[in-house]
A protein has these predicted regions:
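Short hydrophobic/aromatic helix or loop-helix immediately within or flanking a transmembrane segment
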Residues: 85-103, 107-130, 302-303
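Membrane-lumen/periplasm interface segments of specific transmembrane helices
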Residues: 55-72, 86-87, 227, 231-350, ...
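Transmembrane-helix motifs of polytopic, lipid-linked glycan transferases
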Residues: 124, 136-160, 343-350
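Signature aromatic-anchored transmembrane alpha helix within multi-pass, membrane-resident enzymes
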Residues: 256-260, 405-434
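Loop-to-helix entry region of an early transmembrane alpha helix in multi-pass inner-membrane enzymes
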Residues: 112-116, 120, 128-150, 330-339
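Multi-pass, polyprenyl lipid-linked donor-dependent membrane glycosyltransferases
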Residues: 140-144, 170-199, 203-204, 220-232, ...
Length: 436
C-alpha cells in the first residue's frame, strides 16, 4: 500500500524544482527579498510580526466600535448572547455548536450548515481552559491565524526565492490588511481554513508524500465545504509524481477519498444523528434569498453575471441598498463583494499568466472562488463573496508581486486606505451593523 503513495519519478517538472524552490533558486542561494539573512526562525518571527501589526488595527476598530457606535437591532440569531460582539452573525452559530452540538430542522435554519472542525476545536479549548465557548472560539481563530502568518512567511521564502525585494513583506501585509480579512480575527472559521490551505500548498512545494497532502486537504474539508477545491491541485501533484497513467489512476482513486475524510466523517455523523448524510447541503435552501427556476436558468444567470448587475439595480430584490442603513452605506461589504470576487479571480489569472503562480496555486485559487459562485452566488446575491475571496491564499503572492513593482509611496497610500477600511469594517461588525 505504501508504494502506491510513493513518488514513481524524482525528476523536477515545470512548477517546482525537486528542493521546492522555483526559478533558479537553490537552498543556499541569496534571496532578493532578505539578502539571504532570513532562516526558518526569522521567517516565523516575520510572519508573527505582521500578524501582530495588522491585528492591532482590527483591535483598535473593535474598541472604537464598542465604545462609540450604536448597536443595531437585528433579527439575526443570537444564542445565549452575552455581549460577545466578536462572535456576531455566523459566530453565534459556531458558539451554539461548540456549546450544545448540532441540530437539524428540514425547513428552518439549522446549525448543520456549519462544518465541525472549528467549533469542535473551540469546544475542546473551552473544556480545557474553562473559557466560555465564544471566547474559546476567538482564541482558536487567532492562534490559528498567527500560525497561518508564520507558515505563510515560511512558504513565501521557500516558494519564491528569487522574488523582488520587499515581496514577502508586501504579501504578508496584504493577507493582514485587506478589509475583509477582519473576519480572520473573529469567531469565524476562516483562519482555520487558511492554515489548512497553506499547509497543503507547502506540502506540495516540499514534495511531501501524497497521502500526507491528502490528509491535510481532508482537514480542510472538515473546516469548510469549499475545502474540496484543493483536490484538483492534489490530482495535479499526483500526476506529476506518477510515471505511468495506470499509476496515476490508481493513486488518484485512493487519494481522493482520503482527501475527503473530513466531509465524509461529517456526513456519517449526520446520517447517524439526523438520518440524512447531506443535511448540511439541504439546509442551504433555508438561507437562500431566491431559488433558480431551473438548473438551466441558473447556469445562464451565472454565465451572464446576472447576480452582479442585479446587485446594483434598485428595483431588483437583491439590491444591496435595501439591506444597508445610512451609517453603514459607505462601508457596505454587500456593495463591495463583487469587486473583491472579480478582483481575486483577476489576480489568480494574472498570476498564472505571468508565471508568478504554479499550476497548483492557480487551480486551487480558481476553484476556491468558482465553487462558492456556483453554489450560492445566485441564491444569495453574492453575499459574503468578499469574505470568501479573502481566504484564497494564492491571491496574496500576486498582490506582493504587484506591490513590489509600484512606487513605495503608492503602496503606502493604498495600505493606509485598506487599513482604515479594515478597522472600520471591524467596528461596524461588532455592533451588528448590516455590512455583510
Amino acid at each position: 500500500m505504501s508504494d502506491v503513495f510513493a513518488p514513481e519519478c524524482e525528476a523536477p517538472h515545470e512548477d517546482f524544482a525537486v528542493d521546492g524552490t522555483v526559478g533558479n533558486g537553490s537552498p543556499g542561494s541569496t534571496r532578493a527579498d532578505d539578502g539571504g539573512a532570513f532562516g526558518l526562525g526569522d521567517s516565523i518571527v516575520l510572519g508573527l510580526l505582521y500578524f501582530w501589526l495588522t491585528s492591532s488595527i482590527v483591535a483598535m476598530g473593535v474598541a472604537l466600535g464598542v465604545g462609540y457606535l450604536p448597536e443595531v437591532p437585528t433579527g439575526a440569531h443570537k444564542f445565549d448572547y452575552d455581549g460577545d460582539f466578536y462572535a456576531n452573525w455566523d459566530g453565534q452559530w459556531y458558539k451554539d455548536i461548540a456549546r450544545h452540538g448540532y441540530f437539524y430542522k428540514e425547513h428552518d435554519y439549522s446549525s448543520v450548515a456549519f462544518f465541525p472542525a472549528f467549533p469542535l476545536a473551540g469546544r475542546l479549548v473551552a473544556r480545557v481552559t474553562g473559557l466560555r465557548e465564544e471566547a474559546a472560539l476567538l482564541v482558536v481563530a487567532n492562534v490559528f491565524l498567527a500560525a497561518a502568518f508564520a507558515l505563510f512567511s515560511v512558504y513565501l521564502r521557500e516558494r519564491f526565492p528569487d522574488a523582488p525585494k520587499d515581496f514577502r513583506g508586501y504579501a504578508l501585509l496584504a493577507m493582514g490588511i485587506l478589509p475583509t480579512t477582519f473576519f480572520f480575527r473573529m469567531a469565524y472559521s476562516e483562519s482555520t481554513f487558511l492554515i489548512c490551505q497553506i499547509l497543503a500548498l507547502l506540502g506540495i512545494a516540499r514534495r511531501w508524500p501524497l497521502a500526507v497532502v491528502a490528509l491535510v486537504i481532508g482537514l480542510g474539508t472538515a473546516t469548510r465545504p469549499v475545502g474540496v477545491a484543493l483536490i484538483p491541485a492534489l490530482l495535479l501533484y499526483t500526476k506529476d509524481q506518477s510515471a505511468t497513467r495506470g499509476g496515476y489512476v490508481l493513486k488518484s482513486a485512493m487519494l481522493v477519498p482520503l482527501a475527503c475524510w473530513g466531509v465524509a466523517a461529517y456526513m456519517i455523523y449526520q446520517a447517524v444523528a439526523f438520518g440524512d448524510p447531506i443535511a448540511f447541503a439541504r439546509t442551504q435552501a433555508n438561507w437562500a434569498a431566491r431559488t433558480a427556476p431551473s438548473l438551466g436558468a441558473k447556469v445562464v444567470a451565472l454565465a451572464t453575471l446576472e447576480p452582479f448587475w442585479t446587485l446594483y439595480t434598485p428595483s431588483a430584490p437583491g439590491y444591496w441598498g435595501k439591506h444597508t442603513g445610512p451609517l453603514d452605506f459607505p462601508f457596505s461589504l454587500r456593495a463591495a463583494d463583487p469587486f473583491f470576487f472579480l478582483g481575486a479571480l483577476g489576480l489568480i489569472f494574472l498570476g498564472f499568466v505571468k508565471k508568478w503562480l504554479s499550476k497548483y496555486e492557480a487551480v486551487s485559487g480558481a476553484c476556491l472562488l468558482l465553487i462558492p459562485y456556483w453554489t450560492h452566488g445566485y441564491e444569495q446575491h453574492l453575499t459574503s463573496m468578499g469574505r470568501f475571496a479573502a481566504a484564497v491564499v494564492p491571491v496574496y503572492p500576486v498582490l506582493g508581486r504587484i506591490a513590489a513593482a509600484i512606487p513605495a509611496p503608492l503602496v503606502a497610500a493604498l495600505a493606509a486606505m485598506s487599513g482604515f477600511l479594515l478597522g472600520a469594517e471591524a467596528a461596524f461588525f461588532v455592533r451588528w451593523h448590516t455590512i455583510i
